[in-house]
């Protein structure tokens, strides 16, 4: 099991993921794509990465917008695994 990060560890890790914030105890980001096809394509690629990590996002999609929340339920909060997935998602979004 992974260990929940402290508040100072989270703040330090957020410096490398500036587009992410913490909302309601979860790592949070909103993406905007050109259209629904691009948003859904990203979600498909993201799902493959998440499945490979066995770490699945909470997400909500409307047209070209995608909201993602990451947390590690077993640890009861944000862990390094959430930041690892956030980095993969950012790399996918960057193309």
From Swiss-Prot:
- SUPFAM superfamilies named in the record: PCD-like (SSF55248)
Provide the GO biological process annotations: tetrahydrobiopterin biosynthetic process
UniProt GO MF annotations: 4-alpha-hydroxytetrahydrobiopterin dehydratase activity
Pfam families xref list = Pterin_4a
Q: Which UniProt keywords apply?
A: Lyase
InterPro entries according to UniProt: PCD_sf, Pterin_deHydtase
Q: Which reaction does it catalyse?
A: (4aS,6R)-4a-hydroxy-L-erythro-5,6,7,8-tetrahydrobiopterin = (6R)-L-erythro-6,7-dihydrobiopterin + H2O
Which residue spans traverse the membrane? Answer: none
The record's family statement is:
Belongs to the pterin-4-alpha-carbinolamine dehydratase family.
Q: What is this protein called?
A: Putative pterin-4-alpha-carbinolamine dehydratase
Naturally occurring in which organism (per UniProt)? Solibacter usitatus (strain Ellin6076)
């Amino acid at each position: 099991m992974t260990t929940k990060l402290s508040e100072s560890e989270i703040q330090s890790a957020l410096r490398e993921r500036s587009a992410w914030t913490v909302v309601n105890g979860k790592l949070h980001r909103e993406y905007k794509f050109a259209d629904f096809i691009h948003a859904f394509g990203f979600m498909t690629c993201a799902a493959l990465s998440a499945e490979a990590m066995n770490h699945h996002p909470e997400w909500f999609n409307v047209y070209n917008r995608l909201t993602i929340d990451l947390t590690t339920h077993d640890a009861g909060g944000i862990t390094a695994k959430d930041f690892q997935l956030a980095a993969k998602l950012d790399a996918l979004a960057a193309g």
